[in-house]
A protein has these predicted regions:
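Catalytic beta/alpha-barrel core
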Residues: 68, 98-101, 159-169, 193
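Mid-to-C-terminal alpha-helical segments outside catalytic/metal-binding sites
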Residues: 244-328
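Conserved, mostly hydrophobic/aromatic
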Residues: 9, 97, 135, 153, ...
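Histidine/acidic-residue-rich catalytic or RNA/ligand-binding cores of hydrolases
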Residues: 109-111, 140-154, 171-178, 194-205, ...
């Protein structure tokens, strides 16, 4: 997976994984009692790849622990408890917590408030902070429980919103998202496949961008939805082809946002927002990675101009000549 990501230009990944499977250690016929061994291997493989010649440019990966929203209270609490246990054992590998599954077929966030408050209380007692990165608003409704997940996600302090498809319908909420520096993780191909929109042309992301909402592109279950690779090329290509106002500069802004809002390290809410506001002017890991990205972006733009500049000039000249001929 890391090989595929790096080959596609992705240097950092915040993975989401639902822990509803048994993990078997190599050569063992009985599953592990918990996921500690899996995370041990996960961390070792990341460092092994980064130390290799092939992976020397890879920044790393962390995991957003993902629960299933349709489960009952006991199972969700047990899953949350397992998340806390792994965070205590491998704090550098767990970056946040989310609840996934079909939103309108599962429990809304307002129904899960007791479990979420219990989770936060347990984290505080253990002296750890596991922020929320909620899926919310992945729906067509307006005022439904699923749509209102957006409001609850913001009130619960989510740092990013997965999908946020229905956000464009709520001007006041848009202003809150902007004020709180919350990123919207948009997944165009997923939204098409799941029939939230007929094509990328009718996707609401351009409306959010026009209102100044910070957004990024994400792939959302590529192995299930048909991309069949871990990279981002398919979603970026869809966006480039579908939205004329976006262009190369717009794609660059979306990519930069994915670096700006990445969960590189544990930070409290105030430090998280401060570093996002500071961007490249800061002095932490986020600023360092954004500076690296900016250098590579400038190099990429230079390559585009060098490789295709003459062709572009020829096309512009041809367009002017055609226009003059038409006037004559």
């Amino acid at each position: 997976m890391m090989q595929q990501l790096l080959a596609d230009g992705v240097k950092w990944v915040d993975l989401r994984l639902a822990f509803i499977f048994f993990y078997y250690a190599e050569g063992k016929e009985e599953p592990e009692a918990n996921y500690e061994r899996m995370f041990k291997v996960f961390g070792e493989e990341i460092e092994k790849f980064k130390a290799s010649e092939e992976g020397k440019d890879f920044w790393g990966a962390r995991m957003i622990w993902t629960g299933i929203r349709v489960l009952d209270t006991r199972k969700i609490v047990e899953d949350m408890d397992a998340c806390i246990g792994i965070k205590l054992a491998y704090p550098h590998l767990i970056s946040g917590y989310d609840l996934v599954g079909q939103e309108d077929g599962g429990r809304p966030l307002k129904d899960l408030l007791p479990e979420l408050f219990w989770f936060k209380k347990q984290c505080a007692e253990e002296g750890i902070d596991i922020p929320f990165f909620f899926h919310a608003g992945e729906c067509l409704g307006d005022g439904s429980d699923t749509d209102q997940n957006l409001f609850d996600a913001v009130l619960l302090g989510t740092r990013r919103i997965g999908h946020g498809f229905s956000l464009y319908k709520h001007p006041l909420l848009i202003d809150m998202v902007k004020d709180k520096k919350i990123l919207v993780e948009s997944c165009p191909i997923s939204n098409e496949v799941l029939r939230l929109c007929a094509s990328v042309m009718s996707h609401p992301l351009p409306a959010l961008l026009a209102r100044g909402v910070s957004c990024s592109l994400c792939n959302d279950d590529p192995a299930i939805l048909g991309q069949d690779t871990a990279g981002m090329t398919h979603d970026f290509w869809q966006a480039l082809q579908g939205w004329d106002n976006l262009g190369l500069a717009g794609l660059g802004s979306l990519a930069e946002n994915s670096v700006r809002w990445a969960a590189f390290e544990d930070q409290n809410a105030a430090k998280w927002v401060h570093d996002i506001k500071e961007a490249t002017l800061g002095n932490g890991v986020r600023a360092e990675k954004m500076k690296q990205w900016s250098v590579e972006w400038e190099q990429f733009c230079l390559w585009v101009v060098t490789e295709f500049g003459d062709d572009g000039e020829s096309i512009r000249k041809l367009g002017k000549e055609t226009s003059l001929d038409a006037q004559d």
